[in-house]
Amino acid sequence: MTGTHTTTGTPSAAAVSARDWGWRHTTRRDFALRHVNFDIQPGERVLLLGASGAGKSTLMAALAGVLGGADDGEEEGSLTIDGVDARQARVRSGLVLQDPDSQIILERVGDDAAFGCESLGVPRDEIWQRVHESLDIVGLDDIALDRSTQHLSGGQRQRLALAGVLAMHPGLLLLDEPTANLDPTGVREVHDAVRQVLERTHETMIVVEHHIDVWLDLIDRVIVLGKPESSGDSDGVSADDHTGGVIADGTPDEVFAAMGDVLAAGGAWVPGRRIPTTYRDADGVLQPLAARDRDPQVQARVCSPEPLLIADDLSFGRGKPLGEHVNLSFYGGEVYALMGPNGAGKSTLALTLAGLLPPLAGHVRVSADMVPDGRSDDPHAWTSRELLGRVGMVFQEPEHQFATGSVRAEVALGPKSMGKSDEEANRIADDMLARLGLTRFAPANPYTLSGGEKRRLSVASMLAAAPRVLIMDEPTFGQDFATWTEMLRLIAIARDEGSAVIMVTHDEPLVEALGACRVMVTPANDSDVNGISNVSGARDDIGVRLGADSASAADVVNAADADGAANDVTVRAAAATPVVRVTPPSDRTETERPASPSWFVAKLNPVTRFAMGLLMCIPMFFSLDVVSASVALGIEFILLWIGGVDPLTVARKTWPVWIGAAGAFISIALYGQASGATYLHFGAINITQGSLYLACAMFLRVLAIALPSVILALGLDPTDLADGLVQLVHLPSRFVYGGLAGMRMFTLLQDDWRALGLSRRSRGLGDEGAVRRAIAQAFSLLVLSIRRATKLATAMEARGFGGDQPRSVARVSKLHPVDGLGYVIAVVVPVFALIVAITTGFWNQPLLS
């Protein structure tokens, strides 16, 4: 990729050294790492491996200088970057984490990329040169700097996080599983972006990744960490038959030749490792993993003759349809893989099939033998308890599912809710925990597990309920090879016990190993999909199942042609992958928000707009009469009309204010202080001349105070306001920008709240009373908010936020003559209204004259 901007200086590659280094978190008994020794030369590209729990992420956080100090844990030995303690050398390292959402700090692309440079005090002119340069390197140079980060795909967000790090010129690039949350396209995007970075900057790189093959062409050295002795894992084989520290160090060929078996046992995806083709069922009998390889008798026994779940002319989405006229049938004894790019709508389709989101049009139906007594065949119409054991959903975010205080209770919850005894439910839970290597965590709180362990727990808790239709959103995310293999086995067992398993996944090895039928969910403008069976926008009722008699066949059954005649159609899976066409993500972006409905207000500095709202309110608080409120309100309407906002637009934009003002009028008119003539008296209701006057005064005062404040706030950009508060009002940047980042997190928490409600419905807990349900969800949301805040704080700290150096600014906030006019208006209008009321004798008069 050719750069188009002048280089502002290439960062020098950093040298890294560890001398008998170790770290123990304050809340843990055992050391996360111990006796770590290595030297990394400038420009080296290192792959950091180790079993789950070996402390890879802890080491990466330490190198980024965000691990904490003496209050956060106990440190041994030394860890340095260019000879300086890693905590003091934070400006020399840049950390990119797993989750793109947890690293996006500001709303606009350019602001987010510039955030780290501002934290380091880089001069303003150089900031934008660095931003353009870094966005160019990662392939985002064609995206407008003012574009909202909410409209980026997962791969684009991760590349933006990488660009924000590159703009800091760190010298040491730290990548902690940066592709774990991405689809194959996103993985390629990030990989290629990193390759561009290394070719142009020659920075030192350390990357942590389970899937070694992703980075194999970019690395020249492999370092393997072992677990400290006290952290042994009793649940299975791992690479911890060592005292910790570095157990292997060399070129990729040397390490994989010498340590391949140990790494594989520890869970790494070693190149050349064979994917299993068989598994042992609950009786210990060897069975094929791929459905196409099953014995015909087994096939006949486990496969349902009729579909268990049908999408009939389905339109799905959240408010606006993402896909329309979708027709699919899912059979028992089969595995289906909903595949496609990030953001296409796979999870939304899965939630709709699970009966958790209502169809926008059409129907989702289940087979007759699954319908609860007296109910329709639409799972969305069922109660939460009726869903349990029939249709189950494993959510993309495991923490959305947690509803108990221990790992064991989490798995036992489903069986208990289905009426099984405590003893039987606990037996099922213990068996499931043993299968997934979670036995030692049985008494632990689910929130204390690692990301991969949480994913296994979320799958185990739903498998324990043995639903007839099991829908799983990214079931193998974050798994090493050992736990991935066990997850593969559990899915195969569920399938061969007659369940229809529907997976949202990007995991090609998983799909291949299970012989799953692919259903592509892809944007309507994507011409690269190899499929002839378009199941959206058509009238066909297409059911897809794997053929038992062919290694690569998929039967399309119960099809109807355009004339409605039934046909039995058989097509090859390789050529006839069903395709659900959805609205392209680029077409779902929100229209650009105007800075204000008023041309005059749009020209004002955000701080001026904020201050005007306050200044216009304060004098009116000292008045409660019809005249002052009427004068102020009349002048405000005239000024808004001159500024380009007609009265009808004002009313439309501020309708909640009018409702509030009307409510105040009614309550005061009916129950206000009585004086003057009485018009109606009935019980507590007493409408008098005085109460009506006060009601009118309150109605007008509410409008006079609130209408201009709302118009001034409409379209106000939070980032521009934050810049103004720091630069013009001189509020502490740490307070202002921390609050700004928190505002963005609030949007994510709204999504979390909705997901928690859907999850509790899926787990049989959605029939509780509204108050009890809200309390339970509020606790879960509190935990999620703390965890999100922690991740966000880490991302901000990794970008230099809160450091000792003075902060610079990328966007200058200035006041102009028009702002002076705004301040004059804000003072003159309410003061003039008060003067008129005082001179006419109406100021705060309780009765009409």
Model features per residue range: what roles?
Residues L49-A51, M339-P341:
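The feature captures the beta-strand-to-loop junction immediately N-terminal to the Walker
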Residues A64, A354:
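Helix-to-loop junction immediately C-terminal to a conserved catalytic motif
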Residues S148-L152, Q156, N445-L449, E453:
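Conserved ABC ATPase signature
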Residues V165-L166, M462-L463:
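ABC ATPase C-loop
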Residues L173-E177, L470-E474:
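Catalytic Walker B motif of ABC-type/P-loop ATPase nucleotide-binding domains
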